[in-house]
Amino acid sequence: VTTTDATRDTGRQPRLQADHDAPDATGPDRATALLAAMTLDEKAAQLVGYWLDQTGVVAPMQGEMAAAADGRTLADITRDGIGQFTRVYGTRPVEPDDRAAWLWAEQRRLKRETRLGIPALVHEECLTGLAAWKAATFPTPLAWGAAFDPALVEQVGAAIGASMRQLGVHQGLAPVLDVVRDPRWGRVDECIGEDPYLVGTVGTAYVRGLQAAGVDATLKHFLGYSASQAGRNHAPVHVGAREVADVYLPPFVMALRDGGARSVMNSYAEIDGVPVAANGELLTGLLRDDLGFDGTVVADYFSVAFLEVMHGIAADRGDAAALALEAGIDVELPTGDAYLAPLVERVRSGLVDETLVDRAVLRVLRQKERLGLLDPQAFEDEPPTGIDLDTPLHRSLAKQLAARSLVLLSNHDVPAGTPVLPLRAGASVAVIGPNADRAEALQGCYSFANHVLASHPDLPLGFAIPTVREAMVDALGDDAVRSAAGCAVTGSDRAGFADAVAVAAASDVAVVVVGDQAGLFGRGTVGEGNDTESLDLPGVQRSLVEAVVATGTPTVMVLLTGRPYAIGWALDGDAGADHGAGGSLRPAAVVQAFFPGEEGGTAIADLLTGAASPSGRLPVSLPRAAGAQPYTYLHPRLGGPSDVTAADSTPVRPFGFGLGYTTFAYEELTVDASVPSDGWFDASVTVRNTGAHAGEDVVQLYGHDVHGSVTRPEVQLLGYARVALAAGESTRVRFRVPVQRFAFTDRRMRRVVEPGDVQVWVASHAAASRPGGTVPAGGIVASGGGAVRRPVPGSATSRATVEVTGPVHEVTLDDPRVVEWEVG
């Protein structure tokens, strides 16, 4: 080992040459060689992040948990090295060029001035695009689910990853693979949907895209976070092991095994009294031993310290560090509150085995080695300049994803005898509502605008985001559009109603844009920490819509939200009331947009004017009431409405629902008669565009296990395909289905496929069923309390029966999980 004069008399270990020539740092296993040369302090330093800018509120209890400033320089703080830099671009607004220059210089300093010369890994949030100033904002993940288009999401992930890698960022804290169960939870907009297969296929596509650009994806939140009690953030999770295995785990299995995800983040929650951050059965036994994961597990921000201050299972930070490290958390984020001095003291006193530290450090070093951080030339090039984080490619992809995510929920005839949408040429339009002219309303909780920039109100967004009003003016001309806000998103002030009503009455059509404001921890109506007890639209927005409808002007309600709301009044009216003049409560049309991002306003204008046809489908059920939650369409027979309860959990609109400007029919379903329990079967259907306009359909293949050894869902999405057809055109869609799609966890807690009959059919949504088709018989009827229910539009084939033959098949990780499909 070569020493330098600067370290000879410091009492510290001699400094290694920065090119890693010693010890064997250019050999086949540089990580192992570096680990062998490390002091305990240097090891601990690799297991933590350092947060340079702890301003604003972007993490739970950030103010309480933030380390006190100690006056030391960054060089002194990182004298032993550092594992990660926390959000150097994403904590406050910084010019990308300036920050890149700083980062390159800082990485070179780490290489030259620390003994081991190891650069820091840089992580950033990237759920709706890189969460940095002037970076493109894509639709929120709930919109990814609504698009039912994994290939497009993969392209979006690749574009996000390219921006991050250009800036010297190595790890992205996305995607969220939590399965939605309760729309009252504030973090629903970060999720993809309520179906594990949809979450898994779309989430895996994002992982592939991000990692193809050289950025490690981080799967979160492992495991069961979205099942928190009553939709309350961080609340205890009370789900059984079978539900964990069959609902919450499959998306992670897909993203790990099929997507090759390289990092995982723990859930904040506790399951059956054990916080996940201290649960070795999950983080090591399940994740590593059973699933074969060999990447890094990073702590959700402050979750190691939360073992002490929130969960109360650790006496102090050192105790928390010991619990988390033993459970399997390799890296403490965002800072080293527990894994630095408290952990080092525990190791030196013999209370923690140093081999646990070595295990985590080796994983970190191997990640850095794979990402090129141990290469001699790392950060020796010039930092990027003229950085553009919102290129034409970003905007094109953002618009495509936004357009495919918009869900048309209703579109009734107006007195002229035609549906109100698309708007007729030459119509004057009133654009009304609290979200009609606010760029923030188009963006999700983890967008930079709502996550960080809300704490810097004097700064601009940094790039163009046309609002719905601005996009309508662009589409129709200034003279054709009138506008009024009417009210705010929250509060009870109705002073603006009169202006809104006047503008609507003077127009041919009114477009009322309502919904949410995303934010964190009380700053907004949805987002992290913004859970709700009610699923009514916030504030007086419903009253605003009703006041506009009462003018008699045909009214389109556009929802810009991060969760599904209980809007049965807008879709079905009260007790059978129809749309029309005379004070009816029901708008002529309703469009659901889950925070559609920077091109969302333009995509909405295109849909309203007919420049694009709606093709999004609901990734979550639209709830009837808050009291019916939690809910999922994936329920067994007694999980739905029945004659043994007066409560009706039937959603207002089901999973997979969505209308267009044309209609589709499904014909000639053919399905293999039998399949071995470890095999594949084919299902083919003709899809016909029966309307007068071109359009895209999401063809949904559903199934039902008729008799299982445990209760099974009445309806289960098996696979899906997006198909574009001209008016009158038809095509054949073939699904190739691994019978593993019917797998479940049996009474012995094995994941199996059992022999017996299963039903298979194609439908336009989860509740669509052909009249006279095969349905369960006897005893199960919706009571509904006598409420009038309008039928939900939809079409379906009859159900075909497939016999699964052979012995019980115990599913392995090598079994196929994904349905293949082809068109033509």
What is each PLM-predicted segment?
Residues V1-R748, E754-V762, A766, V823-G824:
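Glycoside hydrolase catalytic-domain context in secreted enzymes
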Residues P738-D815, E820:
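Terminal connector regions
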